[in-house]
Every structure is written in structure tokens, then in C-alpha cells.
Amino acid sequence: MNTLQSGVLVVDKPAGVTSHQVVGRVRRLMGTRKVGHAGTLDPMASGVLVVGVNRATRLLGHLSLHDKDYTATVRLGVGTVTDDAEGDVTVTTDASAIDDRAIHAAMVRQTGEIQQVPAAVSAIKVNGRRAYAKVRAGEDVVLRPRAVTVSRFEAIAIRRHGQVIDVDVEATCSSGTYVRALARDVGADLGVGGHLTALRRTRVGPFDLTAACVDIFAQDAVTPTPMTMAEAAALSFPVVHVTADQAAAIRVGRRLSFTVPAEVTAIIAETGELLALYRPDDEKDGQSRAICVLV
């Protein structure tokens, strides 16, 4: 690949692989070090991981803010230190007496605009250190609740196995939501503990599994073809097309003499090139200012 070429890949990350390993594989296949991803997926999880190559890495912070879809399995009756199947068991409780109606009601209480305490084993920094590093060192970690939106959280199937209950769920939630924490909190609400045994991300904003590139971990994997930055931006944000004269000013980050339609708006030249992301100017009515210039 020409290292000046930039674009976005949608990778279907397999379970058992870290997000960083996906980045490493893309670096080797694409022949460039400048690769990043939008929104980490835990090693046990599979599904959509949006990857930026070269200049497209500058889009990732904005792409990661989209809402996301997941399918998952919640096991009720067992809690773990990580809130998923990777961690040590912290509690076991007979969940067999819990009926389906109670499960649905507990899930409803985790729907909408909620205050969620993130999973303790997470990449959130506490006093300059990652929370997961503190937990692994045996330190107590107290994370503050954060506002998240869970617009959909539904049970698709409920399966009973002795003292535990497995609930297959589908969820749509805002950036920053921990599905592991939803499992934990449903279990806590029901008084039996809960954790995730499976997690698959099926969508990040406009990017879903149908857009996933070839299997990059196959032995005979070929260099994937990324979508252009303009294509990715047009899927993700409102678009404003500008003239050649306007494009010249945008290339140096000047204000625009009109208000763009959204807090993140893609500016595309007559040539089809993505020039920048702009937002309305809070200080000057009727103008817009650059979030980032991409050329």
C-alpha cells in the first residue's frame, strides 16, 4: 500500500484477539505504522472494530462517539471480578427461582438514560493508571458513575441450566456504555450476580458487519481495500460540499462564513476529497470553525 493512502476499514474482530492485535495485523498488511481503532473491544468479544489508516486515524475519535449495537449472553447466578467470563468468580447464588417477568423488569430498569459505574477492569485511568492495572495489582478501584443512554436492551431468549440462567440479549447504547456492567447490574438488581459469557458488536454508527473486510487473520489474507475518508465521513456526518475558493481557505483552517448543519460536519471539495471537519462557531454567529483539517 502507498503509505500516503488513507482510509477506514471495518474489521470483524474474532474472539480471543485483542484490539491492539488487530491494529498490528493491519499495519503488516497495509505496510504502514499509522493505524488505530475507534472503540476498544475486549479480547473475549467479537465483531465490528473500526480501523483508521494513515490520515484517517484523525477521524477515529469522532467515529467512536456513535451509538453501538451488541448481541450478548448474560449469565445470572454468577458474578466475576471482570463482569465477564475472563475473571475470577466472586459470587455464586442459586438463580433458579427468578422468573422471566423479573428478568425483563430488571432489564427495563437498565434502559434509558442511566448512571452507570463502569466495569472495574477497564482502560479508564484512575490517578494516572489504568483501572485494570490497579485491579490486577490487588488494589481497590472505585469508579464514578457516568451518564450513558441504553436505548434498547431486550431479552431474545432465556435458557435455564440448574442454578444459573443464561439470557441472550440485544442492546443499543451510547458511546461509553459497558455491556459487561449492564450484565453485572441486572444480576445485582435480581440479587444473584451476573456476568457476560459472550459479546458481539454488530454495529458502530453507520458501520455494521456487512461492511467488514476480508478475514485479515487468514493465512492467505490479502491487503484489504479501505473505504476512502470521504466515504466514511459521508456515512457518519452531515456533509457540506464547497467550491475551490472555499477549499483553499479550509486547507489552512480558516473560519467559514456560514453555519454548518451539525456539531461535526464533513467538508468535501469539488474533487470529492475530505478536507476537514467543522462545527458552528460559538463565538461568531453565522460562522463555522474547524475541528480538524485533514489535508
Swiss-Prot record:
The keyword tRNA processing applies. Pfam families: TruB_C, TruB_C_2, TruB_N. The active site is at D42 (nucleophile). Keywords: Isomerase, tRNA processing. It catalyses: uridine(55) in tRNA = pseudouridine(55) in tRNA. One of its GO terms (biological process) is tRNA pseudouridine synthesis. CDD domains: PseudoU_synth_EcTruB. Its EC number is 5.4.99.25. GO terms for molecular function: RNA binding; tRNA pseudouridine(55) synthase activity. InterPro entries: PsdUridine_synth_cat_dom_sf, PsdUridine_synth_N, PUA_sf, tRNA_psdUridine_synth_fam2_C, tRNA_psdUridine_synth_TruB, TruB_C. Belongs to the pseudouridine synthase TruB family. Type 1 subfamily. PANTHER family: PSEUDOURIDYLATE SYNTHASE TRUB1 (PTHR13767:SF2), TRNA-PSEUDOURIDINE SYNTHASE (PTHR13767). Responsible for synthesis of pseudouridine from uracil-55 in the psi GC loop of transfer RNAs. This is tRNA pseudouridine synthase B. It comes from Cutibacterium acnes (strain DSM 16379 / KPA171202) (Propionibacterium acnes).
